[in-house]
UniProtKB/Swiss-Prot annotation:
The gene is rplF. The lineage of its organism: Bacteria, Bacillati, Bacillota, Bacilli, Lactobacillales. Belongs to the universal ribosomal protein uL6 family. This is Large ribosomal subunit protein uL6. PROSITE patterns: RIBOSOMAL_L6_1 (PS00525). It comes from Streptococcus sanguinis (strain SK36). This protein binds to the 23S rRNA, and is important in its secondary structure. It is located near the subunit interface in the base of the L7/L12 stalk, and near the tRNA binding site of the peptidyltransferase center. It holds the Pfam family Ribosomal_L6.
Amino acid sequence: MSRIGNKVIVLPAGVEISNKDNVVTVKGPKGELTREFSKDIEIRVEGTEVTLHRPNDSKEMKTIHGTTRALLNNMVVGVSEGFKKELEMRGVGYRAQLQGKKLVLSVGKSHPDEVEAPEGITFELPNPTTIVVSGISKEVVGQTAAYVRSLRAPEPYKGKGIRYVGEFVRRKEGKTGK
């Protein structure tokens, strides 16, 4: 059984946390994140350590306890280090460009796809076929990267499309001739 909720969250240097009516605000060198948590879970801040306590050991409380701890830890990591997801484009003529805060993708359609960067998200292009999505919120970084990938998901026959770096795409064999 998982005991993630019982682990102590250690705050790195430069990270401050405040809790008011279970609305937690985490401030760090990269920015500030605020999130409301369940009233059932008690969040205690003691110096540079944060502990979470549940009122009883019911199944619902255990699940909320672990989830709350994971979300809070992601907030702490986000404001201190940040998160990033890398995507790569494979295909003839597939490339990306930046126009201000807008990502413009040429992925074999009759028109270019434009993706506006949500608040707190930055796009970087180390080369025209690699996209780096970075920010302080793990949730928003993941959703933005998934949206960019969904514009041209990798297809199983030639492997063309937008994929995460290191993602394995299952390939299929094409039709065989007579």
